[in-house]
């Protein structure tokens, strides 16, 4: 229901705009995980300098729809807090037919049948 990622993502080159290319990819992945798994994604990224490397910060919280609820500033330390409502998970999942209509016992039974028919 909640994925927590802690990273030390260093700053790398600029993308087509004024953002670092690494920030764009990390944020896209976090949004994709949030919406694909209909989970909250909490990402805490290191900020500051160490051994000649710069870490960009930008910690965030993404909701089960893949939208940012909270986004920290880049290149600055911050203490961020965000309240999440786990009931939003049920509401979001009930709107998605793939998850709403999931039948895990059927899948388990069919996988067991396939394995029995094709032992390796």
Model-derived regions, located:
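A short, polar/charged loop-to-alpha-helix boundary motif
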Residues: 76-95
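Cysteine/selenocysteine-centered motifs that mediate thiol-based redox chemistry or coordinate metal-sulfur cofactors
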Residues: 89-120
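CN hydrolase (nitrilase-like) catalytic-core segments centered on the catalytic cysteine
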Residues: 1-80
């Amino acid at each position: 229901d909640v994925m927590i990622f802690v990273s030390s993502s260093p700053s790398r080159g600029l993308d087509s705009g004024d953002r670092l290319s690494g920030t764009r990819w990390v944020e896209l992945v976090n949004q994709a995980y949030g919406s694909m798994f209909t989970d909250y994604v909490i990402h805490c990224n290191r900020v500051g300098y160490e051994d000649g490397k710069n870490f960009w910060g930008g910690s965030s919280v993404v909701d089960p729809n893949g939208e940012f609820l909270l986004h920290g500033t880049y290149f600055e330390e911050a203490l961020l807090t965000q309240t999440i409502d786990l009931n939003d998970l049920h509401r979001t999942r009930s709107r998605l037919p793939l998850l709403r209509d999931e039948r895990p016992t059927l899948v388990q039974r069919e996988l067991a049948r396939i394995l029995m028919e094709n032992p390796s």
